[in-house]
Design a protein with these regions (language model features):
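A mature extracytoplasmic/lumenal domain signature
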Residues: 74, 82-86, 129
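Polybasic, proline/glycine-rich intrinsically disordered low-complexity segments
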Residues: 1, 5-29, 88-149
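Glycan-recognition and processing domains
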Residues: 4-61
Length: 151
């Protein structure tokens, strides 16, 4: 059983986990985050129709090595939209490649990273930043789309 079209399971360990969930069919006008008015605008083509984790933006500075764990369907592409103001954490740069695409969420530019998952992949995603001195930033967003969706 899938939570969405491409996300099979999700485990979210931050303080606001009870309201975080998987949404389907990403498109302009839908809210990026569960807790603030944050409609997608000019969503890149590769993300349109994707599943995404509708995270709580208040969890942006929460620190955990296993903040999110998800299993995805066969041959999916996992995308991370990460706030350009924050240095990318090690888990992001080790598992994902910069996609040279951006999007805007809640007034901030988000850099996109991609990971081409193979058969029934599971991923563990950590904290949004490793710098505990930061005081602001958008929570990263996770999108999962069919592998044939390219930028």
């Amino acid at each position: 059983m899938l939570l969405g079209k491409f996300i099979k399971t999700l485990n979210y360990t931050a303080p606001n986990a009870s309201i975080v969930h998987v949404e389907i069919d990403a498109r302009d006008g839908k809210n990026a985050y569960v807790n603030i008015d944050s409609p997608f605008t000019a969503l890149p083509a590769a993300l349109q129709g994707a599943d995404w984790v509708q995270a709580d933006n208040r969890d942006a500075l929460y620190s955990a090595v296993d903040l999110m764990e998800l299993a995805v369907a066969n041959h999916a592409t996992v995308w991370i939209a990460h706030d350009h103001r924050l240095p990318p954490p090690n888990w992001l740069t080790k598992q994902f490649k910069p996609a040279n695409l951006t999007m805007n969420v809640a007034g901030q530019t988000m850099n996109l990273y991609r990971h081409d998952a193979k058969a029934n992949a599971s991923l563990t995603l950590g904290a949004n930043t490793e710098n505990t001195r930061l005081t602001e930033g958008n929570m990263y967003l996770v999108f999962v789309a069919a592998a044939d969706k390219t930028p």
